[in-house]
Design a protein with these regions (language model features):
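N-proximal helix/coil linker or "cap" segments that precede and/or mark the start of modular domains
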Residues: 1-6
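A short beta-strand-turn-helix
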Residues: 7-24
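A generic fold-level signal
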Residues: 19-21, 29, 69, 146
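Structural alpha/beta surface segment adjacent to cysteine/selenocysteine redox centers
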Residues: 27-28, 32-112, 116, 172, ...
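C-terminal cap of thioredoxin/glutaredoxin-like
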Residues: 29-30, 36-46, 108-190
Length: 190
């Protein structure tokens, strides 16, 4: 009997969109069946355009399984897509189709996003990425997340309503703080 090869699984902690060296990180804990998360996803897209080069975004899973029966599998599907570098394509697809997130639909969305893993559906059925979703959920709980969408700007909980204007103000404040921290270091070299 041959031992299975171990495969390194890419977690959501390692999946960002935006400049990897950006001074501000916007992290969201969300649920693919949540209407509020779907709406705020459009806000995040606008923020990424406005703060191009200054902002990177990380989406973390916080499925509200008591009210959203497909949220867990949708999160797992996004991680399955992430293994082939298709997380963001799947992320957008899941929000666009948030009312149809059954396993067969998830497999079709994955194909539409360019995922070629023939075991994609099998991985969903076997919860191959379930532990990773649970890891995000537990981290969210540790950080005080109780509902979605929940945002963190440079690891600080954002407490306002997640509108474009409010998040923009939070990001601008983080950029100002970053500049203040940078100035003393450059003066010390002079």
């Amino acid at each position: 009997m041959k031992a299975k090869d171990s495969v390194e699984i890419i977690s959501t902690k390692a999946v960002f969109v935006g400049d990897p060296k950006a001074p501000v990180t916007l992290m969201q804990f969300g649920d693919y069946e949540s209407e509020a998360c779907a709406k705020v996803n459009e806000v995040v897209e606008k923020l990424l355009k406005e703060f191009q080069g200054k902002l990177k975004f990380n989406f973390r899973h916080f499925p509200l399984t008591r009210i959203h029966q497909h949220a867990m599998k949708a999160a797992e599907a996004s991680l399955g897509a992430a293994q082939e570098g298709k997380f963001w394509e799947m992320h957008r697809m899941l929000f666009a189709h948030r009312r149809r997130l059954g396993a067969i639909s998830l497999r079709e969305y994955a194909k539409d996003c360019g995922v070629v893993n023939k075991k994609f559906l099998e991985d969903l059925v076997n919860s191959t990425y379930g532990w990773q979703v649970k890891s995000d959920l537990l981290e969210g709980l540790d950080k005080g997340v109780r509902d979605v969408p929940a945002f963190f700007i440079n690891d600080e909980l954002f407490t306002g309503k997640p509108t474009f204007e409010n998040l923009r103000k939070g990001i601008e404040a983080a950029l100002r703080q970053h500049k203040r921290k940078k100035k003393p270091a450059s003066k010390a070299r002079a």
